[in-house]
């Protein structure tokens, strides 16, 4: 059975958290499936209401006089027995009635039941709420399958993963056979991506045409969602931005050029359209920084950004079937820079890492920057054989004392204070640990 990384957080919530739980994410990333799986394996009885399929329940939520009235009416809407302290209510597709989030405080305060909520476009919808339930709601964002999750489908032994982790940690070369096998699997991941329906189609038929059909269907669903934006002109802009992403990633610097939408537009006038795509979970940003220095957020210039698709399989589908074939065959003529950068952005975002990039006329461009517990990490993504040519990293790592890492198709090595890693080792990159700060007031007394 496929395990998702988010299961651990959901199970911890079931066991130890009295708040309501909100699972957010783009369409078809597997939210409903994993919630059901966790609830079925728990000690609780769960009652699921889909607010699209069951409009009466949405009306009950909308019109209930108080908590007691709500519970009474919900008990009439299900054949399952509702037992205090032993029942979890699962409300799916809550974008139909987003105001349930403003009422969740009263349900949580009541304390008799647990509540889990899910839906699509919630990142967008929540922005319009009059009153957000601060302190009463735990939120988890789900993404397409990561490469680590994808690997489960191929029965890779734990010993192999442990060997790779050791090579990553100790900067040791990987056995050539294992390295080749892992790169082939990573290539397959870039072709199929992490959308569960596409992965399932591949496993059932091994037919890439079925995968492509799934991807195209998902994109069409996204475009229907774009039309739900409140103003007609912005519906068109959102759609145009999304359609342009694959081409914009083929720019020499990968930066999204606003003039390609309309030469008379300025970012400030359409910034909310980009934010809509990010909050909907269908696009991922990497913002420019004016200086590769911690804290990166302080140096962010949000009007300059790279924009990536949230699923690498969808990107390679939009590039065409021949692109997928060239990836699978390791064709040396493929221009894979945009593909490699997108998969890196997807993997790191999945880990909760905020992404930035740096571009200087004096020093050159760094593809990605992020922060770990030791400071800024410089990432270069190389798709060809010249993976050791990176003048920008050479210049910047010395000036700013930053850690430098190059991801490519090649094996592990460490030269001139630069760590070279194969792309599949993205699975071992971790988010910056939260620092523990001692705020004992006695330390500040004279």
Give the role of each language-model region.
Residues 23:
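Hydrophobic anchor at the beta1->P-loop junction of P-loop NTPases
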Residues 34, 38:
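Hydrophobic positions on the alpha1 helix immediately C-terminal to the Walker A/P-loop
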Residues 53-84:
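Short glycine-rich substrate-engagement loop in P-loop NTPases that contacts/grips substrate
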Residues 127-250:
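Interdomain motor-coupling "hinge/lid" segment immediately C-terminal to the ATP-binding subdomain
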Residues 200-366, 370-373:
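Accessory nucleic acid-recognition modules appended to NTPase machines
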